C-alpha cells in the first residue's frame, strides 16, 4: 500500500492565507482547503472533497460552516472535533488538521502581519511560549543554530510553505513487511524504515534526519528504536508519543512514525483478512 500527503500555503493579495492538503493513497483521494485572515488566522472558508474511496469514484464533500470563525492555530483541536463528531469522518478532520499545521509553519513569513516588530521578536516569543516542547526548545542554551539562521533571511510573499509525507509498504522476505516513511517540508527532512514479522513484531526501526534547525535535533532519531520488539497491531497513539514525543523528542519524527506504523498495521490487518 502507498500513502502520499501534500500540504501547502499561499498568501493572497487580499490579506488572506490559503492552505490546502491533498491525500492520495491506496484507500482514497481527498482534498481539504481553508482560507484565513493573514493577521488573525481566523478561518473564513473551509471546504473538502472526497474524490475516491477504495475503488469507488463517487465525489462527496462540501463546505464546513462549523470551522468558520475558528483560529487556525494551536488549540484548534476542539473546533475540529465539533465539526466532525462522527468517527467515520476522522480522516476528513485529519486533513483539516494538516491545513492548520501548514498555516502554523507559515507564520514565520507572516510575523509582521501577526504583530511582531521583527523576526527576532517572533523568535523570542516562540522561545517563551514553547519551552520543553521538543529537544530543540528544551536545550536552547546549547543549540548552535537559531531558527532564522536555519531558514535564512529571505522573506516569502507568495508561496509560503510546502510539506510532503510519503509512506510505502511492501513484502520483505518470505513473510514479513517493510515500510518506509519520508517527511519533507520547507524546513525539515526525516525518513524512517520499519521491518516487521508476519505477526506484526517490529524487528527494525531506523530514522535518519537530513535537515533540521540544529544538529541537536538529529539525536532524536535513535528514540524510535525503543519500539523494536513491540507489536505494530497493538501499539496505540500514547505508546508512539511516549517514544518520540515530549521534551526530548521531535514532533516531525513523531508525525511520520505514526503515519508509517498506521499504514503498516493496516497492511497487516488486510493480509490477516485475506488469510481467514
Short names for language-model regions:
Residues 138-177:
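Short, compositionally biased leader-like segments
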Amino acid at each position: 500500500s502507498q500513502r502520499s500527503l501534500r500540504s501547502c500555503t499561499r498568501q493572497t493579495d487580499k490579506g488572506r492565507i490559503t492552505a490546502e492538503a491533498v491525500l492520495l493513497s491506496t484507500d482514497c483521494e481527498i482534498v481539504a482547503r481553508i482560507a484565513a485572515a493573514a493577521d488573525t488566522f481566523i478561518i473564513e472558508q473551509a471546504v473538502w472533497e472526497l474524490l475516491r474511496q477504495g475503488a469507488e469514484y463517487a465525489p462527496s464533500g462540501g463546505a464546513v460552516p462549523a470551522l468558520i470563525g475558528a483560529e487556525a492555530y494551536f488549540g484548534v483541536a476542539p473546533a475540529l472535533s465539533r465539526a466532525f463528531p462522527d468517527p467515520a469522518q476522522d480522516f476528513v478532520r485529519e486533513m483539516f488538521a494538516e491545513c492548520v499545521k501548514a498555516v502554523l509553519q507559515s507564520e514565520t513569513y507572516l510575523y509582521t502581519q501577526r504583530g511582531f516588530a521583527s523576526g527576532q521578536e517572533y523568535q523570542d516569543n516562540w522561545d517563551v511560549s514553547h519551552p520543553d516542547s521538543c529537544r530543540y526548545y528544551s536545550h536552547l542554551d546549547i543549540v548552535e543554530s537559531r531558527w532564522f539562521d536555519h531558514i535564512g533571511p529571505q522573506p516569502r510573499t507568495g508561496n509560503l510553505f510546502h510539506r510532503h509525507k510519503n509512506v510505502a509498504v511492501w513484502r520483505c522476505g518470505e513473510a514479513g513487511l517493510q515500510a518506509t516513511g519520508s517527511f519533507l517540508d520547507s524546513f525539515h527532512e526525516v525518513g524512517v524504515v520499519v521491518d516487521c514479522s508476519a505477526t506484526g513484531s517490529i524487528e527494525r526501526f531506523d530514522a535518519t534526519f537530513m535537515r533540521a534547525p540544529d544538529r541537536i535535533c538529529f539525536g532524536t532519531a535513535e528514540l524510535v528504536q525503543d519500539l523494536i520488539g513491540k507489536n505494530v497491531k497493538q501499539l496505540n497513539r500514547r505508546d508512539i508519543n511516549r517514544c518520540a514525543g515530549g521534551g526530548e523528542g521531535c514532533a516531525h519524527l513523531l508525525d511520520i512514525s505514526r503515519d508509517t506504523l498506521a499504514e503498516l498495521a493496516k497492511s497487516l490487518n488486510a493480509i490477516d483478512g485475506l488469510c481467514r
